[in-house]
Design a protein with these regions (language model features):
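Structured, hydrophobic secondary-structure cores that serve as assembly/anchoring elements
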Residues: 177-308
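A structural detector for beta-sheet-dominated domains
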Residues: 4, 35, 267-269
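A broadly used, surface-exposed interaction patch
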Residues: 1-21
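Residues that cap or initiate secondary-structure elements
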Residues: 9, 38-40, 68, 272, ...
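A glycine- and small-residue-enriched flexible loop/hinge signal that marks low-structured segments
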Residues: 24-212, 243-245, 249-265
Length: 308
């Protein structure tokens, strides 16, 4: 855990501190929140979100919204509240939670850290196991109080891609919906970052651990592709990737509508087709992967036909 104290009355802008934190320790952490009793302005939060989005290293930035004023207004393209700006900015690495908070009420005092609880649950996933991946929806936030929202408030927050820890009519408390500010599912953001890191590490280890070299030949590229396949196989084992129909653009021999029996498809052109300058720079031909995510079921339509 890296803690950076900040005092709004004496310190430089918090976004400046975050930039320095990234420069000094960016590869040593993944998720972070702005946890401070001082007020962080919307402009500063937007700057931090931009820093996170453009960072060379993968990070997730969490915000707990304790001012629920935006829950009382319908979202439009002209809405000026913070969640609306983050949504329109299509920030895929920022996640916002709304939570009822009262500094004078011991039951609600910790609610300003709701996003920390949610990220803690998400980051506890062990991707090395079998069927271990999760969806953030339906999870609990131990020791924190749910927010009692009206239907219209819930709708208004959801329209802004704001998550909640809500009370349901069957007396259960759950996190919903589990999305980033862009609308991307949070578990897919997390899983994609994990898989990217695993592929990079696995391929690097092939180069690093070879007692001779990986030749710049089709056989050499095949060894690298095997390493990529190894990494994605673990994503199949842990439930992040699954067999399914490829509905995106075609590439290589993969056509739109094709069924991916393994959950993924790998392609690399022949070394013989490489540009000479790439060959002289000792680059591998580009390796492409088409991956089908397993997704998650969040709702169930049920039709009951009754006959007498």
């Amino acid at each position: 855990i890296i803690a950076e104290p900040w005092d709004s009355t004496t310190d430089t802008a918090i976004s400046t501190r975050v930039s320095k934190l990234f420069a000094d320790y960016g590869r040593n952490f993944y998720g972070f929140i702005t946890a401070t009793s001082a007020t962080v302005s919307d402009d500063e939060i937007l700057k931090i979100a931009q820093i996170v989005e453009s960072s060379a290293d993968s990070h997730i930035y969490g915000i707990t919204l304790t001012d629920l004023a935006c829950a009382n207004s319908v979202y439009t393209d002209e809405s000026t509240d913070l969640p609306s700006k983050l949504k329109r900015g299509q920030f895929t690495r920022t996640i916002v939670f709304a939570s009822e908070y009262d500094a004078n009420d011991s039951a609600y005092r910790l609610n300003k850290y709701l996003v920390a609880s949610a990220l803690g649950r998400m980051f506890s996933v062990n991707f090395s196991g079998s069927m271990t991946t999760i969806t953030l929806k339906f999870k609990q936030a131990p020791s924190l109080q749910p927010t009692n929202l009206t239907q219209s408030q819930d709708t208004n927050l959801s329209a802004r891609n704001v998550n909640k820890y809500a009370i349901y009519s069957n007396d259960t408390y759950i996190i919903q919906e589990g999305v980033m500010s862009s609308g991307m599912w949070a578990d897919e953001r997390h899983g994609s970052d994990w898989l990217q890191d695993l592929i990079q590490t696995t391929v690097y280890n092939v180069l690093y651990q070879s007692k001779t070299k990986i030749p710049q030949t089709d056989d050499g590229v095949a060894r690298l592709m095997a390493a990529v396949a190894n990494a994605i196989d673990q994503a199949v084992i842990n439930g992040f990737v699954a067999p399914g129909v490829w509905n995106s653009d075609p590439f290589g021999d993969l056509e739109s509508g094709a069924y991916l029996e393994k959950g993924y498809y790998l392609y690399a052109p022949s070394v013989n087709d490489q540009l000479q300058n790439e060959r002289e720079a000792r680059k591998s031909p580009v390796i492409q992967a088409g991956i089908k995510l397993a997704g998650a079921i969040h709702s169930v339509p049920i039709i009951v036909n009754i006959n007498r």
